[in-house]
From Swiss-Prot:
Residues 1457-1469 have a biased composition (Acidic residues). It comes from the Eukaryota. This is 1-phosphatidylinositol 3-phosphate 5-kinase fab1. It comes from Schizosaccharomyces pombe (strain 972 / ATCC 24843) (Fission yeast). The lineage of its organism: Eukaryota, Fungi, Dikarya, Ascomycota, Taphrinomycotina. Transmembrane segments: none annotated. Its EC number is 2.7.1.150. GO terms for molecular function: 1-phosphatidylinositol-3-phosphate 5-kinase activity; ATP binding; phosphatidylinositol-3-phosphate binding; zinc ion binding. The chaperone-containing TCP1 (CCT) domain is essential for the interaction with the scaffold protein vac14/SPBC25H2.03. The conserved cysteine-rich (CCR) domain contacts intramolecularly the C-terminus, including the kinase domain, and this interaction negatively regulates PI(3) 5-kinase activity. Residues 457-721 are annotated as: CCT domain.
Length: 1932
């Protein structure tokens, strides 16, 4: 991770901040200083040895002792004089200083104090820098032996280049098409979380202030006009050793190569002229470059380098210097007459511009050069060249106005006359008016209309009227608004006075930023408050004004063009105060020292001396004698202002007097006295240095109020000064962008005129007091301000009654969105009249949700809808109730989101007090990054950066472009980047909903000669065309880079003036800047801002889900009713009276059947009527009440079963009777059959006969099942048993009976039919199933199957059990039979005989062998009968009536006891037999249920003979059969069977198969299929609850337990005891207070509930019952919690790596996670702290992203009948994505090790960290700054809480919905603690014993917390919105 560098500004030249800065202003090499001093007027100091003249030495007779050590001089101790101060010292106090400082060989003698001064002023490197400079210059000269003036000017070459512009240049359409900027991405290996995010070093440039170095330039060659000629530093004149590296914004400390430096303007102007040119050439260059450019709207970039391009600029601009005075009151100014011969008497304010001591009119060299320039232009000025040249750089409107026809006047003078004539008409269309600053007050817009003048007017003048009008109107309204906000009296008078002053100031001021001036113009504008007078007395001073009394009353109070000396050293005589000295000696020495010092100063011939320290009175006396006015005790800042405005050197030490310091000057000096308090008569004197260069600085004087009022005005004016200057630069930018400026000015002015003046009103009394006076002054003021009159009246009239806003200290309420929105739309908040900021995104959202919420409340009749979604109204009350429910739910969702956003807005609003003020618009916050073009991975950032406009964190647009283009090979700063060059990277700035990408590209300048100038053009992305090329003007070069980005982000209305394009210039164009054969591309793209959702405090129920569930349940239960009653109808229809022989019974049987049909019809009507009534009268959310119909249905089915049992007993023969008949027939067959027949032929014959006789009743599924039977049979006899089963199943056709069963969607029971039902590994003997009855008929059966897999021991058995269920319904006695099969019983006997098998030789065999074979068949039938008995028992269970639950409850107060009480039982319970379980059972419901079973069983034939099989009857009385009970193995039987003789078929006898088949068919006709009951063997229902317990849905047991009456009563008891305890403590609170106390209980109650239903044992243990109940009540989900848990299904989410089993409730509201033993222990230990933390979330609004846990339970289900054994720990938590459909889901841990899965595109697929990183490479995820702050706060709080509990391995689940642009987040899996195994693994890996990966796999909780925070902060990025003063701060 790259360290973030905080930029620190280099030591600035201005302003001076420390006491040593004034000294450091002279830290330059003496050699260069002496060279520069040749052009300065020399003093009359006698310097024969270039040191202090002996005239200023102290006389030898003055002292006989050393001035420093007081050592007496002797013959051997000589006197020495300091060559700097002139004191007499001894050799021990003597130091030698390098002589080259004073341009001497060797060294000079100085005293120790002077030597220390030299050391302080000149560092060691600077003392010896002259030698380095000489060698460097020598090297440069060797590289470039000759650089002549002709080469530098190269007029012909440049002019010929411009000659190529004969036609307007247009960029080709295919040149540099704007590619789509790749989106920023997050590096997978690191993040910049530790970055402070403010003012990153790679954004900003250090151009404004730099450290001084030896390579200085002369002020005569500089554009800045700065006060110190010895210390001017240029931006590019430094070599590699002098470039500042402590503040490296773009170049990262790298220096461009010399070849590029040489191309730079400032370098070529300063260094080349000094190093390579002769004195004459330098003078010529200086004379040429001294013109005042002013504010020019031609696209000519000024340059000291004397090209013809610059000459034209000089010609265009110089003649427009007007003779105008400043706004200073001149009545108190008088000429002093102290003028010098080289100064003109002209009052021209441009007299001292640009460092010149001469007037332009007196400079013959300039005039001569100007004539040469005009001649050169005329020489090249043919008609086509001149017109096309101007067309290339002037706006089209200007060119059309200048050249109305194709005929261009010959020569420049004619063109100028035409130009001036037209301009004169523009400026004075209807007569004469008082000119505005642009109409004669400013040199930039002044017009010399003399016919003798040959000039070209700058295009700016063409719209000076509209510009002045626009700016004055905008500034006036802005001032009026801000003055009202501050409560300033008489705001309208200020509005009428200040705009003109501010406009003139902005137009005149022009800091030279290239030479080191600050880009903040406020550094050079001082605002002085002088109480008293009137507001109209405010004035502007083009110089400095400061408060200072005169040192002497006799001194002059006014001077013209004084010479000014600035001193910062002390004039006092310094002596050792700790020594005892003679007072007379000290006085004499002091006097002589001061006299000499004053004489030395006066030799410079100053008129004014300003000293920082105190001046001794004797010195003041001598100054007065010399006619010098001296001021002392000046502030350092005042000296700085004087030095800059008057261009004077600050003399910081005595030695500087020997270096010919430069004295400053001004046009006029005066002392003026003002009355500041009329009541007290207080007066104050001010010194005024006026008529200095306008470009260097000025002072605005405020008058007309008291000090407090003026302080408020000063604060406002300081900002408006910057705004006025910014508007000037912005207009230049728009002009360079080819915007139609006159049209823009007109439309903007009209918009401003229509805009009202809302303000934070003052009191009505104040307005009424000042209104009369303001109206009087309106008539005489400027017309541009008159529209403010009506607005002022309207504002004043409304402020007294219903002002839209209060005072600024009484802002509108945070929920008054309409007022806030109106104020933000109507108030002036930006620096520009062309720009309006959008409303804060958060305000738009909360306003929108409030509107929708109110609309729903008004237009929709809502149902009562609690936060949990419990609908109270019944469905029968409203026809459109479903639609109303949906509207209610929609309202709840909107209301919930509205309140959430409202809280965020309130917090945001509280930190945004300056939202309604322009003071909030002084900065912009960006998300900044440097991104690799190829990989899209950011090398720097993304990080939040602050840009303060026109401050040190900002730079100019020109600086940014030049530095970027000159530093293409600079490293990007990325730690892992392989291509470090910035040419392969781009910068990205994200703000609001946009992103600006800045690309650096290679580019060949299309116009030769413009490579060294910044050219501009743009490309429309929609029109696919380029605009014309233009050269960047100087004003555009100074435009703020931060404001340029803001302009691109916010402006979308301004269009260019080209006909082919009507799109927004700033928003929809790609902007190009070319410089040095490089192009910088600015491209704006829109980004998607996602809405962020954290887990809500309250849960909700979507009525559509509830409605869907209820509808499904209604249809399912209706099908159950239909199926059960259909089974009764089928039984009734199959009843026959054929076996009834008694006529009396026959009639009663017929009447009984008729009665059955009547009762069935009555049951149909009753059940459906009751069911529909339950459905209609229950609430929409209550679908469990529908289960109550099952209890009614179950009772009716029990009655029907009893009726048919009675019917069978009365009218039908028993099984025993039928068996006797069949046995008699079989005996007859065997007695008549010959013994030669092989017994083994019987099964084969039966099998073959089955296939032949019943082909139509064999389905494919039946064949498959039969095949499975032969493969999986586990009976002892592996050959005979299949035959027996086949014979038993032959007569079981399936066509009619399953026509009803196929409509069922209820699964069959999991029944084990083996002998030992307690054994798990059991297999069915005959698993024949019906193909029509499949699991597919029940939609959720597959999900419920998965639940059984929760128990690892039941995984294999569960699958087999399901096969048992289907087999049980289709085998043996329970197989239904159709009437067609019954009809065939008689026909079977008469069917054709079977074909005989191939004859086998007959053998003798005994009758006993034959009997043994039949006995084997009998054994198989007995086994089948046992299985049928088991099924009958299961069926009997279903026939039992529903009884109360009667649970056994155990209460635990000790957590460990509650958690471990079942360990011993768990170990042994699985192997218990059914009998042991029944013996150990202590359930109270056992006796009652046993009695019920006995009652039911008593009605059946349960005697030993009741089920005696046919073979028992057949061989019952035969003797000798007992000996055959021990069967032989099948292999042995095969051997014996092979010996049996075979014979032919029995043609005469009836086969045994026919007899048996007829027997089974008859029996099945007498015993039709069993009834269908509403409950399955795996379903359990009790009479005291509507919840059905399902063995494959563990949540149903939890739901049943929580809804049991006993549990509810215990919760009431706990709450009552809590209330009683609080009452005893004297604490009474609301319901929330009680809930909070329940959650904070130190101990919890743990309950264990045990139920028994039939053979099933059900147990549920509830942990922390009252705490979780209170938590659910706080969330508002307690009422619906039971309903949601009633049904669940297996939830399989692919992609995740947790390996845990999950269940999801049918309503998708809750997730159930199956916990391991270790996780359960962690959860129970973690629970108390969790309740404490979550209570702060509910009741103290603590931000959190933790998903809520609603309960922890242990479920134990054991049912031997179905083979179910399920014991598991279940944690119930909320579903983060409830009612949402995220497109992608991510499980994020902040690690990149093994955090990648292959995406399959499945629903609910969970992806990991690396998948997210791959995604955000292409499409980063942005949220608003406020929501990102919320997420940051949530993650900070949650991770801190979890780390304190030693918890780790938690994840942030993130769902992204690209359709709705929403982001859902929540922390899950936060129950894993840092256990000893993790610690050991971490220690081993830290020691390097195993694993050598890039990052540790096991970390501590603290490390995990930090890594998690950093990663999440990097995954989700924030886009800063509307910045309001203080901004939105992180809530950490």
């Amino acid at each position: 991770m790259s360290e973030v560098e905080t930029p620190t500004a280099a030591s600035p030249t201005f302003p001076v901040e420390t006491s040593h800065r004034l000294d450091t202003l002279h830290t330059s090499s003496t050699e260069q200083i002496i060279k520069d001093s040749e052009n300065v007027v020399h003093t009359t100091l006698k310097l024969p040895t270039s040191t202090l003249s002996r005239e200023f030495w102290m006389k030898d007779e003055r002292t006989n002792n050393c001035s420093l050590c007081e050592t007496e001089f002797t013959l051997f101790r000589r006197k020495h004089h300091c060559r700097i101060c002139g004191k007499i010292i001894c050799k021990y106090c003597l130091k030698e200083a390098p002589g080259f400082i004073f341009r001497l060989q060797g060294s000079i003698k100085v005293c120790r104090p002077c030597a220390s001064i030299l050391v302080n002023n000149y560092s060691r490197s600077q003392l010896f820098n002259h030698s380095l400079n000489e060698s460097k210059n020598r090297d440069l000269t060797e590289q470039h032996p000759f650089v002549t003036l002709d080469e530098l000017n190269s007029n012909d070459q440049v002019l010929s280049s411009f000659g190529d512009l004969s036609s307007t240049f247009e960029m080709p359409n295919n040149i540099h098409p704007p590619e789509v900027a790749p989106m920023i991405a997050i590096p997978s290996s690191r993040s910049n979380y530790d970055s402070p995010g403010w003012a990153h070093h790679s954004i900003f440039l250090d151009w404004s202030k730099r450290n001084l170095d030896s390579n200085v330039i002369n002020v005569e060659d500089s554009e800045s006009g700065k006060y110190n000629a010895l210390t001017i530093t240029n931006s590019y004149d430094a070599g590699p050793s002098s470039v500042s590296t402590d503040y490296r914004p773009v170049n990262f400390g790298k220096v461009p190569s010399y070849s590029k430096l040489r191309k730079n303007k400032a370098f070529s102007s300063a260094k080349v002229s000094d190093m390579y040119l002769s004195a004459d050439e330098r003078n010529r260059l200086e004379d040429f470059s001294k013109g005042d450019r002013g504010l020019s709207f031609v696209n000519l970039s000024p340059n000291i380098k004397a090209t013809s391009y610059d000459r034209l600029s000089t010609v265009i601009n110089e003649p427009f210097i007007s003779r105008s005075s400043s706004l200073t009151d001149e009545r108190g100014l008088a000429d002093s007459g102290n003028s010098y011969h080289h100064f003109s008497d002209s009052d021209d304010e441009s007299l001292f511009n640009d460092g010149l001591g001469l007037s332009f009119h007196a400079n013959s060299a300039i005039i001569k050069q100007r004539q040469q320039n005009v001649a050169s232009i005329q020489r090249y000025g043919n008609e086509s060249y001149l017109s096309n040249f101007l067309k290339a750089f002037l706006p089209k409107t200007v060119c059309d106005y200048l050249f109305p026809s194709s005929t261009i006047p010959d020569g420049l003078p004619a063109l100028i006359e035409n130009f001036n004539a037209r301009v004169d008409k523009v400026n004075h269309p209807g007569g004469t008016e008082e000119p505005l600053p642009y109409q004669g007050k400013s040199r930039a817009s002044s017009v010399v209309t003399s016919s003798k003048s040959t000039c070209i007017l700058p295009p700016w003048i063409l719209f000076s009227d509209s510009f002045n009008q626009l700016v004055c109107t905008f500034l006036g309204k802005l001032l009026f608004q801000m003055l009202n906000d501050e409560g300033v009296d008489s705001p309208m008078q200020w509005v009428l006075c200040l705009p003109k002053i501010l406009l003139k100031m902005a137009l005149d001021l022009g800091p030279d930023i290239r030479s080191g001036d600050d880009i903040d113009v406020r550094s050079y504008v001082k605002i002085k408050k002088i109480p008293g007078g009137s507001i109209q007395d405010c004035f502007l001073v083009n110089g400095v004004l400061f408060s200072k009394k005169a040192s002497s009353k006799s001194m002059d109070r006014s001077l013209r063009r004084p010479r000014i000396a600035l001193l910062t050293f002390s004039l006092d005589y310094a002596c050792d105060e700790q020594r005892i000295l003679s007072l007379d000696l000290i006085i004499s020495q002091q006097e002589e020292y001061i006299i000499n010092l004053v004489n030395r100063i006066c030799m410079l011939k100053p008129n004014l001396v300003f000293a920082q320290g105190q001046i001794p009175s004797i010195a003041l006396k001598y100054f007065e004698e010399h006619g010098v006015i001296a001021f002392h005790g000046l502030k350092e800042s005042v000296l700085y202002d004087i030095a800059r405005c008057c261009r004077a050197d600050i003399i910081s030490s005595i030695d500087k007097l020997s270096l010919c310091p430069r004295l400053g000057t001004c046009g006029r000096f005066q002392l003026r006295t003002y009355v500041v308090d009329e009541n007290k008569g207080l007066r104050k004197t001010f010194a005024i240095l006026d008529r200095c260069s306008e470009r260097l600085g000025c002072t605005i004087v405020l008058r007309g109020a008291d000090y407090n009022q003026l302080s408020k005005v000063k604060k406002i004016v300081e900002l408006v000064v910057l705004i006025a200057y910014h508007i000037k630069l912005e207009c230049a930018l728009l002009r360079d962008k080819f915007v139609n400026m006159p049209e823009l000015f007109e439309t903007t002015y009209q918009s401003l005129s229509r805009k009202s003046l809302p303000s934070f009103a003052s009191t009505a009394a104040d307005k009424e007091k000042s209104q009369n006076h303001e109206k009087k002054s309106l008539n005489s003021d400027n017309q541009s301000l008159r529209p403010l009159e009506n607005e002022n009246q309207s504002v004043s009239s409304t402020q007294g009654s219903n002002s839209p806003l209060e005072l600024i200290n009484n802002l509108p309420a945070s929920d008054d969105y309409s007022s806030i929105t109106k104020a933000l739309k109507t108030r002036f908040l930006t620096f520009s009249p062309f720009l309006s900021k959008p409303l804060p995104r958060l305000l738009n959202q909360v306003n929108y949700y409030q509107f929708i919420r109110n609309k729903l409340l008004k237009d929709v009749k809502l149902h009562p809808y609690s936060p949990t979604g419990s609908f109270v109204m019944k469905q029968s009350e409203n026809d459109n109730v479903e639609e109303s429910y949906e509207e209610s739910y929609k309202f709840f969702c909107i209301d919930e989101r509205y309140h959430f956003l409202e809280k965020q807005w309130t917090l945001y609003y509280s930190h945004s007090k300056l939202m309604f003020s322009p003071f909030s618009s002084q900065r912009i916050i960006l998300l900044y990054s440097i991104i690799n073009k190829e990989t899209s991975v950011p090398c720097i950032g993304p990080e939040r950066c602050l840009l303060e406009f026109y401050r040190e964190t900002d730079c100019t647009l020109g600086q940014y472009i030049e530095d970027s283009c000159l530093n293409t090979n600079v490293s990007c700063g990325g730690e892992y980047c392989k291509t470090n060059d910035m040419l392969w990277h781009y910068r990205s700035y994200v703000h609001g909903n946009s992103r600006i990408s800045v690309f650096l590209e290679s580019f060949s300048c299309p116009v030769p000669g413009l490579e060294e100038k910044i050219i501009m053009w743009s490309y429309c992305k929609f029109c696919k065309k380029n605009t014309h090329i233009t050269v960047m003007s100087e004003e555009t070069w100074k435009y703020s880079f931060g404001k340029y980005l803001e302009f691109m982000f916010y402006n979308s209305q301004i269009r260019d003036r080209f006909e082919f394009c009507d799109h927004s210039v700033m928003a929809q164009h790609v902007h190009y800047f070319g410089y040095c054969n490089m192009a910088l591309r600015f491209q704006r793209d829109l980004i998607e801002i996602f809405e962020l959702f954290v887990p809500s405090v309250t849960l909700r129920n979507n009525p559509s889900y509830i409605k869907e569930l209820k509808e499904k349940e209604y249809k399912r239960l209706k099908g159950v009713i239909e199926k059960c009653l259909s089974s009764v109808a089928s039984r009734i229809n199959q009843i026959k009276c054929d076996w009834v022989t008694d006529p009396e019974k026959f009639e009663s049987c017929t009447s009984e059947i008729s009665k059955f049909r009547t009762l069935l019809s009555s049951d149909y009507t009753e059940l459906y009527s009751e069911f529909d009534s339950i459905y209609l009268n229950s609430s929409t959310s209550d679908y469990l009440s529908l289960n109550s119909i099952l209890r009614v249905l179950q009772g009716k089915m029990v009655k029907w079963e009893q009726r048919f049992l009675d019917y069978q007993r009365l009218y039908l023969p028993s099984y025993k009777e039928l068996s006797k008949i069949a046995a008699a027939q079989i005996k007859k067959v065997f007695l008549e059959r010959p013994l030669s027949q092989t017994p083994l032929d019987l099964p084969e014959t039966l099998e073959n006969t089955q296939i032949d006789i019943y082909p139509s009743f064999k389905t494919e599924s039946t064949d498959d099942q039969l095949e499975k039977v032969t493969q999986t049979n586990v009976a002892s006899n592996k050959r005979v048993a299949p035959y027996a089963d086949s014979m038993a199943n032959v007569g079981s056709p399936e066509s009619d009976c399953f026509s009803v069963a196929t409509s069922s969607d209820i699964p069959k029971a999991n029944i084990d039919f083996t002998n030992d039902i307690s054994t798990q590994n059991t297999f069915p003997a005959s698993p024949v199933s019906n193909s029509g009855f499949s699991r597919q008929t029940y939609p959720n059966i597959s999900q419920r199957q998965g639940v059984n897999m929760l128990s690892h021991k039941r995984k294999s058995a569960s699958t087999s059990d399901r096969r048992f269920v289907n087999a049980s319904s289709t085998s043996g006695m329970n197989m239904p039979i159709s009437s067609s099969i019954s009809a065939k019983i008689s026909s079977i006997q008469n069917s054709t005989k079977y074909s005989p098998r191939k004859p086998i030789p007959a053998k003798d065999v005994r009758v006993s062998s034959l009997v043994r074979r039949f006995e084997e068949l009998s054994l198989q039938l007995q086994e089948k009968q046992k299985r049928d008995e088991e099924l009958i028992k299961a069926r009997r269970k279903r026939a039992l009536p529903v009884v109360p639950s009667k649970p056994v409850v155990e209460v635990f107060n000790d957590l460990n006891e509650a958690f471990d009480d079942e360990n011993s039982e768990d170990e042994n319970g699985i192997n218990d037999t059914k009998e042991n379980r029944a013996t150990e059972s202590n359930f109270s419901g056992v006796d009652s249920m046993s009695k019920e079973r006995e009652n039911v069983s008593s009605n059946e034939d349960n005697s030993p003979e009741a089920f005696e099989d046919i073979f028992g009857i057949l061989f019952k009385n035969e003797s000798g059969l007992e000996e055959q009970q021990n069967l032989e193995p099948s292999s042995q039987m095969d051997k014996e069977g092979s010996k049996l003789p075979t014979s032919g078929p029995l043609a005469d006898k009836t086969s045994v198969y026919r007899i048996l088949s007829a027997f089974w068919n008859e029996w099945n006709s007498l015993n039709p299929p069993p009834f269908e009951f509403p409950l399955q063997p795996t379903e359990h229902m009790f009479s005291d609850s509507n919840v059905i317990i399902r063995e494959d849905e563990p949540s149903s047991l939890i739901s049943f337990t929580l809804s049991s009456p006993d549990y509810l009563s215990k919760m009431v008891e706990i709450e009552d005891s809590m209330d009683e305890a609080l009452t005893n403590q004297g604490l009474q609170g609301s319901t929330q207070f009680k809930i909070e106390n329940l959650m904070l209980k130190p101990t919890g109650t743990h309950l264990k509930y045990q139920f028994e239903e039939g053979s099933a044992r059900l147990s549920c243990k509830v942990f922390f019952a009252e705490q979780f109940s209170a938590l659910r009540r706080a969330c508002g989900c307690e009422e619906t919690f039971v309903t949601s848990l009633a049904r669940c299904s297996l939830w399989e989410s692919s992609g995740g790596k947790s390996g845990s089993a999950f269940l999801k409730t049918f309503d998708k509201k809750y997730i159930l996670k199956v916990l391991s033993r270790l996780e359960s222990d962690s959860l129970l230990n973690f629970a108390p702290a969790y309740f404490d933390y979550i209570s702060k979330v509910f009741f103290h609004e603590l931000p959190t992203a933790l998903t809520k846990i609603f309960g922890f339970y242990r479920v134990d289900i054991r049912n031997p009948t179905t083979g179910t054994i399920c014991k598991t720990d279940i944690m119930i938590m909320e579903n983060v994505f409830y009612d949402e459909c995220p497109s992608r889901i991510f499980d994020l841990k902040g690690s990149m090790r093994n955090r990648h899965v292959e995406s399959t595109g499945k629903v609910d697929e969970v992806l990991l960290d690396e998948n997210l990183v791959e995604l955000i490479y292409e499409s980063p995820i942005f949220v608003s700054e406020q929501l990102k702050s919320l997420l940051h706060s949530c993650l900070w709080n949650d991770t801190l809480f979890l780390s304190k509990l030693n918890i780790m391995d938690y994840s942030l689940i993130v769902g992204i919905d690209y359709t709705k642009k929403e982001l859902y987040v929540g922390i899950i899996d936060f129950i894993r603690t840092y256990t000893w195994d993790k610690k050991l693994e971490s220690w081993v890996k830290e020691k390097g014993l195993v694993g050598r990966g890039p990052e540790p796999t096991i970390v501590t909780p603290k490390q995990y917390k930090n890594r998690f925070r950093k990663a999440m902060d990097c995954y989700i990025l924030a886009s800063q919105d509307f910045e309001t003063g203080e901004g939105f701060k992180f809530c950490e």
